[in-house]
Amino acid sequence: MASDLEQLCSYVNEKIENIKKILSLRKLGQDPTLKTTLSKIGDEIITVNELLNQFELEIQYQEQTNSSLKELCKSLEEEFKDVEHLKEHIPSHLPQVTVTQSSTHKPDLDPKESVKAEEPVLPKKPPKEQRVIKEMHFITTDEFSGVPAYMKSRLTYCQINDVIKEINKAVVSKYKIIHQPKASMSSVKRNLYQRFINEETKDTKGRHFIVEADIKEFTTLKVDKKFHVIMNILRHCQRLSEVRGGGLTRYVIT
């Protein structure tokens, strides 16, 4: 019983001490000479909080980079093993490469062979002209520094260029389908091709563009608030322009 009373008294005394501390701190807050100091402390706390958020974003980016590098190393190791295996198991029946030395005396040619040698060589057909797919250029550090702070918020230079990389992936995937012969298309690609054509307007003729559906189709990016903030930054840096119409926003590569 005495032990319980002692614990209760100790608990009550602790609460009283806490109340006294709170009251003393409250009085400090009302002191005009300390208000400026407390305000500065509050500002510093906000600044530290923002720095912690930036550190958190940077740590996430470094973790993603580390994961990608591990996957790359694993892939390279597997390819190296395959090369070593091929090197050790070259089939013996393959012909050996022989180096022939040029002779100063040309052997006599058979008349029939000389006639063949004199026949004109038909010109080769010129290769088909490859269509160039326009991709977005990465932003530079100077351009990133020139973006207003309110626009880029806590985004980093690397995060923006990572999005550009994904946008280029979507652009290349889309226009490879458009340039592909229709006869060789699967039903899925035919449907995509038809959508691409339907999204064209007179303002996008001859220009490369994508819509949000292409981002979802060809990349792992999330079309969220962060994505739209980055698109605004890219428009500010003159990497793209927008053409609206028919309920769609077309992001045109500039």
From Swiss-Prot:
<dbReference type="GO" id="GO:0051310">
    <property type="term" value="P:metaphase chromosome alignment"/>
</dbReference>
<keyword id="KW-0963">Cytoplasm</keyword>
<feature type="compositionally biased region" description="Basic and acidic residues">
    <location>
        <begin position="105"/>
        <end position="127"/>
    </location>
</feature>
<feature type="region of interest" description="Disordered">
    <location>
        <begin position="97"/>
        <end position="127"/>
    </location>
</feature>
<dbReference type="GO" id="GO:0008017">
    <property type="term" value="F:microtubule binding"/>
</dbReference>
<keyword id="KW-0132">Cell division</keyword>
<dbReference type="GO" id="GO:0051315">
    <property type="term" value="P:attachment of mitotic spindle microtubules to kinetochore"/>
</dbReference>
<dbReference type="GO" id="GO:0031110">
    <property type="term" value="P:regulation of microtubule polymerization or depolymerization"/>
</dbReference>
<dbReference type="GO" id="GO:0007059">
    <property type="term" value="P:chromosome segregation"/>
</dbReference>
<dbReference type="GO" id="GO:0005654">
    <property type="term" value="C:nucleoplasm"/>
</dbReference>
<keyword id="KW-0995">Kinetochore</keyword>
<dbReference type="GO" id="GO:0051301">
    <property type="term" value="P:cell division"/>
</dbReference>
<dbReference type="GO" id="GO:0007080">
    <property type="term" value="P:mitotic metaphase chromosome alignment"/>
</dbReference>
<keyword id="KW-0175">Coiled coil</keyword>
<dbReference type="GO" id="GO:0005737">
    <property type="term" value="C:cytoplasm"/>
</dbReference>
<dbReference type="GO" id="GO:0072686">
    <property type="term" value="C:mitotic spindle"/>
</dbReference>
<keyword id="KW-0137">Centromere</keyword>
<dbReference type="GO" id="GO:0000278">
    <property type="term" value="P:mitotic cell cycle"/>
</dbReference>
<dbReference type="GO" id="GO:0045171">
    <property type="term" value="C:intercellular bridge"/>
</dbReference>
<dbReference type="GO" id="GO:0000940">
    <property type="term" value="C:outer kinetochore"/>
</dbReference>
<dbReference type="GO" id="GO:0007056">
    <property type="term" value="P:spindle assembly involved in female meiosis"/>
</dbReference>
<dbReference type="GO" id="GO:0051296">
    <property type="term" value="P:establishment of meiotic spindle orientation"/>
</dbReference>
<dbReference type="GO" id="GO:0005876">
    <property type="term" value="C:spindle microtubule"/>
</dbReference>
<comment type="subunit">
    <text>Component of the SKA complex, composed of SKA1, SKA2 and SKA3. The SKA complex is a homodimer organized around a central W-shaped coiled-coil structure, formed by the interacting domains of SKA1, SKA2, and SKA3, each end of the 'W' is extended further by the C-terminal microtubule-binding domains of SKA1 and SKA3; the complex forms extended structures on microtubules. Interacts (via SXLP motif) with MAPRE1 (via C-terminus); the interaction is direct and stabilizes the kinetochore-microtubule attachment of the SKA1 complex.</text>
</comment>
<feature type="region of interest" description="Binds microtubules and protein phosphatase PP1 subunit PPP1CA">
    <location>
        <begin position="131"/>
        <end position="254"/>
    </location>
</feature>
<dbReference type="GO" id="GO:0072687">
    <property type="term" value="C:meiotic spindle"/>
</dbReference>
<keyword id="KW-0158">Chromosome</keyword>
<keyword id="KW-0131">Cell cycle</keyword>
<dbReference type="GO" id="GO:0000070">
    <property type="term" value="P:mitotic sister chromatid segregation"/>
</dbReference>
<protein>
    <recommendedName>
        <fullName>SKA complex subunit 1</fullName>
    </recommendedName>
</protein>
<keyword id="KW-0498">Mitosis</keyword>
<dbReference type="InterPro" id="IPR042031">
    <property type="entry name" value="SKA1_MBD_sf"/>
</dbReference>
<dbReference type="InterPro" id="IPR009829">
    <property type="entry name" value="SKA1"/>
</dbReference>
<feature type="modified residue" description="Phosphothreonine">
    <location>
        <position position="156"/>
    </location>
</feature>
<keyword id="KW-0597">Phosphoprotein</keyword>
<feature type="region of interest" description="Flexiple loop that anchors MAPRE1">
    <location>
        <begin position="91"/>
        <end position="131"/>
    </location>
</feature>
<dbReference type="GO" id="GO:0140499">
    <property type="term" value="P:negative regulation of mitotic spindle assembly checkpoint signaling"/>
</dbReference>
<comment type="similarity">
    <text>Belongs to the SKA1 family.</text>
</comment>
<dbReference type="GO" id="GO:0000776">
    <property type="term" value="C:kinetochore"/>
</dbReference>
<feature type="short sequence motif" description="SXLP motif; mediates interaction with MAPRE1, targeting to microtubule plus ends, stabilization on kinetochores and is required for proper chromosome alignment to the metaphase plate">
    <location>
        <begin position="92"/>
        <end position="95"/>
    </location>
</feature>
<feature type="modified residue" description="Phosphoserine">
    <location>
        <position position="241"/>
    </location>
</feature>
<keyword id="KW-0493">Microtubule</keyword>
